[in-house]
A protein has these predicted regions:
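Transmembrane helix-loop junctions at the membrane interface of multipass transporters and ion channels
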Residues: 1-47
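Juxtamembrane/interface segments at transmembrane-helix termini
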Residues: 33-37, 48-62
Length: 388
């Protein structure tokens, strides 16, 4: 019965059978009437069966999809708003293998290491570096962006090496002359076969991945304050609160809002002071916040509390410091001119002379292998730092 049902439910089979019977009905000597009658009946069944299957197929077929709307004709939505990366690295197509995980990109590994080192040395976890290719760049070019704004760029040549002249080399090298993007030193891109010669002449030799990574690290350090946003500040306080919950609770928001704490930390980072010792920072802020609210003044208090660590960061564990001092009379003039309470202004000629003499003294210190450090009264320290 299933076979019969399948046969009579298939219009194609019925049509074929009707055609065969119709041909037989036309042959002389055959029972023509019977064959033609059967052919007509099967043809009618095939016609009705075809209509029924078409109706079923129409019911089961989903409605045709609406024609696609061109992107430019669609209404704007929040999905069109693309967040700006806090920190990004864009590379030309020849540098893609350096950052491609599938190709075991060496630069990718170095960037991960840089972020970990930054967290250990500076004291907070910065935003991840978002890496993407940019076909608008030259094939060997790269650029570093901070909040959508370019802060650095350069060229790198995979397979070649940058020979950097530290200032004392014994001869020139053949290659593509350039400048070290991180520190501005003269350099040359050389082939791998020239590495030993470059080392022998006194050059510092690094590969392409190291060039880009060093440049990126230099810019991250110099823009540390901008990388410390509200999210990073809150995460930093939450991290400290795991071991010192009461300390953080007493500070934020009871004494200071989160924005003020962020600004204090940014002031410290702007002046090259790391914020690793958050316990001392939070304690100092809690002690000072009842008398002070200005983030700049609070940062000064924190600097004093961190002074042993700041000195050791510059000089190492030494008991005597070799510093540059200012003559008493000049110090008096500067104090009168640079303090906020005084209406006097620093004479432009004196400012130029001061900058020149300070640069000369700093060079002498550096030539003797000593950090350049100028000793000034606390009340003019910030102004002198900006001036010099």
């Amino acid at each position: 019965s299933q076979v019969v049902g399948q046969v009579f439910s298939n219009p194609q089979v019925l049509i074929l059978t009707a055609a065969i019977l119709g041909v037989l009905g036309l042959i002389p000597g055959m029972p023509n009437f019977v064959f033609l009658l059967l052919a007509g009946g099967l043809g009618a069944l095939a016609w009705h069966g075809g209509k029924r299957q078409a109706a079923i197929a129409e019911e089961e077929t989903p409605a045709a999809a609406a024609p696609a709307v061109p992107p430019e004709a669609q209404e704007a939505s929040w999905t069109d708003v693309t967040p700006v990366d806090v920190l990004g690295l864009e590379v030309g197509y020849r540098l893609i293998p350096m950052v491609d995980k599938a190709q075991d990109g060496e630069l990718l590994k170095r960037i991960r290491g840089l972020r970990k080192k930054f967290a250990r040395d500076i004291g907070f976890l910065s935003s991840a570096v978002h890496i993407r290719d940019n076909l608008e760049l030259k094939p060997n070019a790269y650029r570093i962006v901070l909040k959508g704004v370019e802060v650095g760029n350069g060229m790198a040549f995979p397979g070649q090496f940058m020979a950097i002249n530290p200032g004392r080399v014994n001869g020139p090298l053949n290659g593509r002359e350039t400048t070290d993007p991180a520190f501005g030193l003269p350099a040359v891109w050389i082939d791998a076969g020239q590495r030993e010669q470059a080392h022998a002449l006194g050059y510092t030799v690094v590969d392409a991945s190291t060039v880009v990574a060093t440049h990126l690290n230099h810019l991250i350090l110099s823009h540390a304050a901008e990388l410390l946003g509200r999210t990073e500040t809150q995460a930093l306080l939450d991290h400290i609160a795991k071991d010192n919950p009461k300390l953080v609770e007493d500070l934020v928001p009871k004494l200071l809002p989160l924005a003020s704490v962020q600004r204090v930390l940014q002031n410290l980072l702007d002046e090259g002071v790391n914020i690793r010792d958050m316990r001392t920072i939070v304690e100092t802020l809690a002690e000072s916040a009842e008398q002070l609210t200005d983030p700049l003044e609070l940062a000064k208090r924190v600097r004093v509390a961190l002074s042993p660590a700041i000195v050791q960061q510059i000089y190492g564990p030494v008991r005597e410091l070799d510093v540059i001092a200012i003559e008493p009379e000049l110090e008096r003039i500067l104090t009168q001119s640079l303090t906020a309470q005084s209406g006097a202004m620093l004479d432009p000629g004196l400012a130029e002379l001061l900058s020149k003499r300070a640069a000369e003294a700093a060079k002498q210190q550096e030539d003797h292998g000593v950090p350049a450090c100028l000793l000034v009264p606390d009340m003019i320290r910030t102004a002198m730092a900006r001036l010099l």
